[in-house]
Regions:
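A short coil-to-beta-strand element that immediately follows conserved catalytic motifs
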Residues: 64-73
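NUDIX/MutT-family hydrolases
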Residues: 98-131
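Conserved N-terminal beta-strand and adjoining loop/helix that marks the start
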Residues: 2-23, 43, 74
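Active-site-adjacent beta-strand/loop module that shapes the phosphate/pyrophosphate-binding cleft
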Residues: 75-97, 108, 129-134
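Conserved Nudix-box catalytic region and its N-terminal flanking loop in Nudix hydrolases
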Residues: 19-60
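Short, low-complexity, intrinsically disordered N-terminal peptides in bacterial proteins
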Residues: 1-9, 132-139
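Short beta-strand micro-motifs in enzyme catalytic cores
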Residues: 11, 35, 83-87
């Protein structure tokens, strides 16, 4: 893929949602590389901020209403080559469920041990550091 083609593809915004000592994970029907369990995420639409995209994608995929708290950062994904932004979000209302059965196979709140099993290589370092802190705060 050319650099020009990569630049024209929309970036991806991922929501990092921790509530009651658990992180919201989704299992995609189609794996991206070795990943099947991941954070709720999707493309940033024209005119949308990464925060808005993370909030929208979480609602579309899981039915959960969240609010953006802060952007942890961004990187070029080593497998997909797409720009990823990671946004900490707070759960506001609703119950997480499988709202997008075409794209997802499962939605789950995972504790730190389950995260280690489902994502054995961990997340990008700033995301993993945030999760380690947020999940250890509850034990």
């Amino acid at each position: 893929m050319t650099a020009e083609a990569t630049e024209k593809r929309p970036g991806i915004a991922a929501a990092v949602v921790v509530d009651n000592g658990r992180v919201l994970l989704v299992r995609r029907r189609v794996k991206e590389g070795s990943l099947s369990w991941q954070l709720p995420a999707g493309g940033v639409e024209d005119g949308e901020t990464v925060e808005q995209a993370a909030v929208r994608e979480t609602k579309e995929e899981t039915g959960l209403t969240v609010s953006a708290v802060k952007v942890l950062g961004g990187r070029l994904h080593p497998i997909t080559g797409r720009h990823m932004s990671y946004v900490v979000c707070a759960a506001e209302s609703g119950t997480a469920h499988l709202a997008d059965a075409d794209e997802l196979a499962e939605v789950e709140w995972s504790d730190r041990n389950e995260v280690a099993e489902r994502v054995p290589d961990g997340f990008w370092e700033p995301v993993q550091a945030y999760l380690d802190s947020a999940l250890s705060a509850r034990g």
